[in-house]
Amino acid sequence: MESDLEFSNIVSVLKLVEATTQRTVMAKALSSLLAKTPPQVIDKVIYFLLGSLRPDWEGVELGLAERLTLRAISMATGLPIRQVEELYKKLGDAGEVAKRAAEIKRSKGGGGTIFDFIDTGPKRRLTISKVYDTLMAIAKASGEGAQDTKVKLLSSLLTDAEPDEAKYITRFVIGRLRLGVADMTILDALSDAFDVNRDLLEKAYHVYPDLGKIAKTLAEGGEEAVKAIKVTPGVPIQPMLAERLSSPKEILNKLGGVAICEFKYDGERMQIHKLKDGTVKIFSRRMEDITNQYPDVAEYAREAIDAEEFIVEGEGVAIDPDTGEFKPFQELMHRKRKHNIKEAIEEYPINLYLFDVMYVNGQDLTDLPLPDRKKVLFSIIKPHEHVHHADWIITDDADSLEKFFLDAISSGCEGVMCKSVKLGSVYEMGARGWLWIKYKRDYKSELSDTMDLVVVGAFWGRGKRAGTYGALLLAAYDPDSDQFYTVCKVGSGFTDEDLKKLPQMLEPYKIPHRHPRVVSKMEPDIWFTPGLVLEITGAEITMSPLHTCCSVMLKGDVGLAIRFPRFTGRYRTDKRPEDATTVKEIFEMYSNQKKVKLTDQVP
Ligand code: ATP
């Protein structure tokens, strides 16, 4: 048993995490669990806690529909399928059904009684390896008869499971573990459990976002082994992010007087990898493998980039085939529907605008300054109808920057990205820093920018909105404390269609109490695990005693809130909750807004 861990240990932690509203309790439970986990299985424990068999970018899916899990529950417990389906109707959660069915089986003497336990002894107790390996076998079953194999494998696992174990295994299978245990939470727990510097782990995570691998490397090889984790084609790296400012002068000042400025295209960010064996993979901003949606772009990259192995980055933009003009971001949504990719490729062609290179033929370029990376990038792009370098200038003049910005806007772009060219202008993985600064059109409208906020609660609607949500409680992210702070209650901007689908979209995130990573003074009618990210605009940012956002910075009992918040209609499914606008950004927007007001008053 020493090289394995009884699954019940994980279940105890899951129960605790599910019940608590305190982040410290959750963090302590996770770190104690990891501290006592044998190195051989620490990766499996972490994948289970995160609710995913492998890191998301590997795209491993169990492929077992909820209906089939009910069949497995019926097989494992001997309850007739009709009874299991009735339980499902009543309880509405396959996990609870699995638990209830196992309890019924136990009450009928069908296993799990005290005698059973003595009979078969500890042999029958599930371990994490048994659970994980079986789930992996379920994911791998393919071809004819795969569904039956999957159901049988699951039912064999559930047969050996205690009621609570059955509940969490089933939730995992249907993708509803959703405990709000995020990558950052695990990094904290690892750093605490192994008493290692968190920055070291975070750095490795930026280079190789696979917490199972990082944990195992740490547990088996110590800090040195973690430091040796390298950029690897085929494994996405955490994208570099930009800060924002609202005037060319400020931007040039911040960047040391001169900058490379590029169009900020309104499409989908693509990190494109070519491996030695010729495979091309495309990863999204949140590092999901989106190659299947863009086989055309993968082919263009293969044709247009002259290197055996590479990692480059660019924006894929939908183009009007008749005019060659850019189409808005929403057009790319047609690519998300899995079935008619071929048609979508014809109807919605895409151009790729490259703006960075991070790796070429065995060499990690992320530590090179931007001008050096650009040289490499220009040297490997061959002329191609659909692949170009992003439109760019290098300038030290605010008027030229403003003119370039207006050009970008009139070409249908969102604005410009201004990038540092100084010696230290490395590719900063996973960081939102001042080496890249975005300057967008909507900076000049009401609020200085839209914000991407996380839904953490909802209030029932009345009148016309009876039966659906009247408003949502939204929060910003604080990476330092790994918590979400509320910043507004938003009820406007939702279409009838939005209102109809929101309860459905949010159903999987529903929890009975405030999530331990949410800091809120408000008490909504429904709480959610932070998951869904929405784009919000508003009139201004004001102080508010009702919200908790930035209350730490304001050092008082007041926080910051968005006045007249409105949903822009954009669901940011390309962002994880941890990619939402941060409290620090909101504080900066608030401070800038104050500055603008003061200068407005100068005669
Ligand atoms: P936003 O919410 O403004 O779209 P974001 O939060 O997704 O931005 P940011 O770092 O704020 O990410 O802005 C950078 C985004 O702009 C990138 O993710 C990328 O998709 C897009 N982009 C378009 N053109 C460029 C460019 N030339 N250089 C870098 N990023 C670009």
Curated annotation (Swiss-Prot):
<dbReference type="GO" id="GO:0071897">
    <property type="term" value="P:DNA biosynthetic process"/>
</dbReference>
<keyword id="KW-0547">Nucleotide-binding</keyword>
<dbReference type="GO" id="GO:0003910">
    <property type="term" value="F:DNA ligase (ATP) activity"/>
</dbReference>
<comment type="similarity">
    <text>Belongs to the ATP-dependent DNA ligase family.</text>
</comment>
<dbReference type="InterPro" id="IPR012309">
    <property type="entry name" value="DNA_ligase_ATP-dep_C"/>
</dbReference>
<feature type="binding site">
    <location>
        <position position="262"/>
    </location>
    <ligand>
        <name>ATP</name>
    </ligand>
</feature>
<dbReference type="InterPro" id="IPR050191">
    <property type="entry name" value="ATP-dep_DNA_ligase"/>
</dbReference>
<dbReference type="GO" id="GO:0006310">
    <property type="term" value="P:DNA recombination"/>
</dbReference>
<feature type="binding site">
    <location>
        <position position="269"/>
    </location>
    <ligand>
        <name>ATP</name>
    </ligand>
</feature>
<keyword id="KW-0460">Magnesium</keyword>
<dbReference type="GO" id="GO:0006273">
    <property type="term" value="P:lagging strand elongation"/>
</dbReference>
<keyword id="KW-0235">DNA replication</keyword>
<feature type="active site" description="N6-AMP-lysine intermediate">
    <location>
        <position position="264"/>
    </location>
</feature>
<feature type="binding site">
    <location>
        <position position="438"/>
    </location>
    <ligand>
        <name>ATP</name>
    </ligand>
</feature>
<dbReference type="InterPro" id="IPR012340">
    <property type="entry name" value="NA-bd_OB-fold"/>
</dbReference>
<keyword id="KW-0479">Metal-binding</keyword>
<dbReference type="InterPro" id="IPR036599">
    <property type="entry name" value="DNA_ligase_N_sf"/>
</dbReference>
<feature type="binding site">
    <location>
        <position position="432"/>
    </location>
    <ligand>
        <name>ATP</name>
    </ligand>
</feature>
<dbReference type="GO" id="GO:0005524">
    <property type="term" value="F:ATP binding"/>
</dbReference>
<dbReference type="InterPro" id="IPR016059">
    <property type="entry name" value="DNA_ligase_ATP-dep_CS"/>
</dbReference>
<dbReference type="InterPro" id="IPR000977">
    <property type="entry name" value="DNA_ligase_ATP-dep"/>
</dbReference>
<protein>
    <recommendedName>
        <fullName>DNA ligase</fullName>
        <ecNumber>6.5.1.1</ecNumber>
    </recommendedName>
</protein>
<dbReference type="InterPro" id="IPR012308">
    <property type="entry name" value="DNA_ligase_ATP-dep_N"/>
</dbReference>
<keyword id="KW-0131">Cell cycle</keyword>
<keyword id="KW-0067">ATP-binding</keyword>
<keyword id="KW-0227">DNA damage</keyword>
<dbReference type="Pfam" id="PF01068">
    <property type="entry name" value="DNA_ligase_A_M"/>
</dbReference>
<keyword id="KW-0132">Cell division</keyword>
<feature type="binding site">
    <location>
        <position position="285"/>
    </location>
    <ligand>
        <name>ATP</name>
    </ligand>
</feature>
<comment type="function">
    <text>DNA ligase that seals nicks in double-stranded DNA during DNA replication, DNA recombination and DNA repair.</text>
</comment>
<feature type="binding site">
    <location>
        <position position="315"/>
    </location>
    <ligand>
        <name>ATP</name>
    </ligand>
</feature>
<dbReference type="Pfam" id="PF04675">
    <property type="entry name" value="DNA_ligase_A_N"/>
</dbReference>
<keyword id="KW-0234">DNA repair</keyword>
<dbReference type="GO" id="GO:0003677">
    <property type="term" value="F:DNA binding"/>
</dbReference>
<dbReference type="GO" id="GO:0046872">
    <property type="term" value="F:metal ion binding"/>
</dbReference>
<keyword id="KW-0233">DNA recombination</keyword>
<feature type="binding site">
    <location>
        <position position="355"/>
    </location>
    <ligand>
        <name>ATP</name>
    </ligand>
</feature>
<dbReference type="InterPro" id="IPR022865">
    <property type="entry name" value="DNA_ligae_ATP-dep_bac/arc"/>
</dbReference>
<dbReference type="GO" id="GO:0051301">
    <property type="term" value="P:cell division"/>
</dbReference>
<keyword id="KW-0436">Ligase</keyword>
<dbReference type="Pfam" id="PF04679">
    <property type="entry name" value="DNA_ligase_A_C"/>
</dbReference>
<dbReference type="GO" id="GO:0006281">
    <property type="term" value="P:DNA repair"/>
</dbReference>
